[in-house]
């Protein structure tokens, strides 16, 4: 017989969906703290006691707000149906605190700016009504205590019996949220042990350097840009912005896509289409089985986002998704085309080791770890070294460019833009190729016809391959690949200037000019670095010229 469930049971079922893990407790409370304007958030966990605590220095609540804050669907963030289309806060449903009261013992202490002298502490019943109210000495802000978590969900307690099952996701979540809100100080404590501490910084780059201790600033790039709006929003008084923090592919990459993070309006989200856009841009810039480090944070008009897809709001419906994908792709290409002029970290260590202690800094010299973005105003290839490297002088220092991989990158991008197979004057005869190999070559655009038993006539080839001495070996190699991109990379590698080949001044200047115009001048299609950069201050430090007040006016 179908029957209507009583309200208490309905609330308990709903609470189990909203608060499904210890991470959900932290997520809901931390997001409330950010909505309250906090710039210092502390999370404490006593897992043996099934107890959590979140403290913040946000605007706090007075006693009237405290009394109603845990009632079902009590919120200060929306009041009408129209508000659902313009959500600007992290929380808005009014479900989290009420759900917490259902699955744990909940106590909240808070003091607002308007509270005279003291704050208030309230312990709540499972229905969200106050059970005990008392004044308390507390600084402005809020302290939420969660005790006896999941006492009425024994199966859930058993699922989280091991601390490893929640610590890693909790640390990861707070790190990702810190990237979205770099102005906030974060701490995560386990009992009396500090598990995570992040200081505020001017941008996400400063947070990444704290999260990944092996990183150095010279490995990262940061850019922020206003975006064009979709056609349906052009006439509205709104704006969009995208900030990118990324690792240069020749200096920084990961064995897993664990630091490829998408965020929208202050919250990490899962949008597979945007993730794939980033992976596609970084394709053929990294070594095999390596992934980019990239944090992409959008500030979008609220009417573009539907947050009602998942209780945790980690999955969304995003309006005009192809438009935002295109904007992301464009900005990533622009950012990767920029050549950094600072020395890589290992060379920095060498230069710092050679620097005497207590010397004066060069006037106007930047730190070695400061990322210098933008093209030099002028450059000149001045020499070839060991018939392998090209020395390039520019207004900010020098580059040492490996000629083969630089030319390989140039040819690869040319092939991507202009892939075309041209007819041969005389067919090229192939022997020892099976039908599967021939089919793969045909899939690349080559025109090949049967010419006898196990003999094939090649009637067209990519322009770069025509006239190659080892054309049969090259075609045999190409017959093993399954994608056009892989074939283009192989052709570029085979056709590029070889190391050990002497180049005249005209040739090296032409090579450097073509290389600098590449979409990604950092790595070859197989992920090898192309250049080593040394700025003027790096050289001055190595040669101990730091005592000079102004090297441009001194003869020393």
From Swiss-Prot:
KW DNA repair (keyword) present: yes
PROSITE patterns linked to this entry: DNA_MISMATCH_REPAIR_1 (PS00058)
GO BP, one annotated term: mismatch repair
Keyword line: DNA damage, DNA repair
SMART domains: DNA_mis_repair (SM01340), MutL_C (SM00853)
Protein origin, superkingdom: Bacteria
GO molecular function, one term: mismatched DNA binding
Cellular component per GO, a single term: mismatch repair complex
CDD domains named in the record: HATPase_MutL-MLH-PMS-like, MutL_Trans
InterPro entries the UniProt entry points to: DNA_mismatch_repair_CS (IPR014762), DNA_mismatch_repair_MutL (IPR020667), DNA_mismatch_S5_2-like (IPR013507), HATPase_C_sf (IPR036890), MutL/Mlh/PMS (IPR002099), MutL/Mlh/Pms-like (IPR038973), MutL_C (IPR014790), MutL_C_dimsub (IPR042120)
Keyword DNA repair recorded: yes
Record's function text: This protein is involved in the repair of mismatches in DNA. It is required for dam-dependent methyl-directed DNA mismatch repair. May act as a 'molecular matchmaker', a protein that promotes the formation of a stable complex between two or more DNA-binding proteins in an ATP-dependent manner without itself being part of a final effector complex.
Family affiliation: Belongs to the DNA mismatch repair MutL/HexB family.
Name under which the protein is recorded: DNA mismatch repair protein MutL
Name of the gene encoding the protein in the UniProt record: mutL
């Amino acid at each position: 017989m179908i029957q209507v469930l009583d309200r208490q049971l309905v609330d308990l079922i709903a609470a189990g969906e909203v608060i499904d893990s210890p991470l959900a407790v932290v997520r809901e409370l931390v997001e409330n703290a950010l909505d309250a304007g906090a710039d210092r958030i502390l999370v404490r966990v006593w897992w043996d006691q099934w107890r959590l605590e979140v403290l913040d220095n946000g605007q706090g609540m007075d006693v009237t707000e405290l009394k109603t804050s845990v009632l079902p669907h009590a919120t200060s963030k929306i009041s009408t149906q129209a508000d659902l289309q313009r959500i600007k806060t992290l929380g808005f449903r009014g479900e989290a605190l009420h759900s917490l009261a259902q699955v744990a013992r909940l106590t909240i202490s808070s003091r607002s700016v308007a509270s005279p002298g003291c704050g208030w502490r309230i312990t709540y019943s499972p229905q969200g009504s106050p059970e005990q109210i008392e004044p308390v000495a507390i600084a402005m802000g809020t302290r939420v205590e969660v005790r006896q978590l999941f006492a009425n969900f024994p199966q859930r307690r058993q699922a989280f019996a091991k601390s490893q099952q929640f610590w890693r996701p909790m640390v990861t979540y707070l790190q990702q949220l810190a990237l979205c809100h770099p102005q906030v100080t974060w701490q995560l404590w386990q009992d009396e042990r500090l598990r995570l501490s992040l200081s505020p910084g001017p941008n996400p780059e400063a947070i990444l350097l704290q999260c990944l201790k092996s990183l150095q600033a010279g490995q990262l790039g940061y850019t922020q840009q206003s975006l064009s709006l979709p056609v349906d929003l052009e006439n509205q008084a709104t704006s969009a912005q995208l900030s990118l923090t990324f690792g240069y592919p020749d200096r920084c990459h990961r064995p897993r896509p664990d630091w490829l993070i998408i965020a929208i309006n202050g919250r990490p989200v899962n949008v597979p289409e945007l993730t794939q856009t980033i992976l596609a841009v970084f394709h053929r810039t990294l070594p095999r089985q390596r992934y980019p480090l990239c944090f992409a944070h959008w500030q979008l008009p609220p009417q573009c986002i539907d947050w009602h897809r998942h209780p945790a709001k980690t999955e969304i419906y995003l309006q005009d998704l192809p438009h935002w994908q295109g904007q992301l792709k464009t900005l990533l290409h622009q950012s990767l085309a920029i050549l950094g002029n600072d020395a890589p970290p290992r060379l920095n260590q060498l230069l710092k080791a050679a620097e005497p202690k207590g010397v004066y800094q060069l006037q106007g010299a930047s730190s070695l770890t400061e990322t210098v973005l933008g093209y030099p105003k002028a450059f000149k290839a001045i020499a070839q070294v060991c018939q392998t490297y090209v020395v390039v002088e520019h207004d900010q220092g020098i580059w040492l460019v490996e000629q083969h991989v630089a030319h390989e990158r140039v040819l690869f991008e040319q092939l991507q833009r202009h892939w075309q197979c041209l007819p041969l004057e005389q067919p090229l005869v192939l022997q020892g190729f099976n039908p599967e190999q021939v089919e793969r070559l045909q899939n690349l655009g080559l025109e090949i016809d049967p010419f006898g038993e196990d003999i094939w006539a090649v009637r067209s080839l990519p322009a770069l391959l025509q006239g190659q001495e080892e054309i049969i070996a090259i075609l045999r190699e190409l017959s093993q690949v399954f994608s056009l991109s892989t074939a283009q990379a192989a052709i570029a590698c085979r056709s590029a200037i070889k190391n050990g080949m002497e180049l005249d001044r005209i040739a090296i200047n032409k090579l450097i000019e073509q290389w600098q115009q590449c979409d990604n001048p950092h790595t070859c299609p197989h992920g090898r670095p192309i250049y080593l950069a040394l700025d003027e201050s790096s050289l001055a430090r190595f040669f101990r010229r730091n005592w000079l007040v102004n090297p441009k006016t001194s003869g020393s």
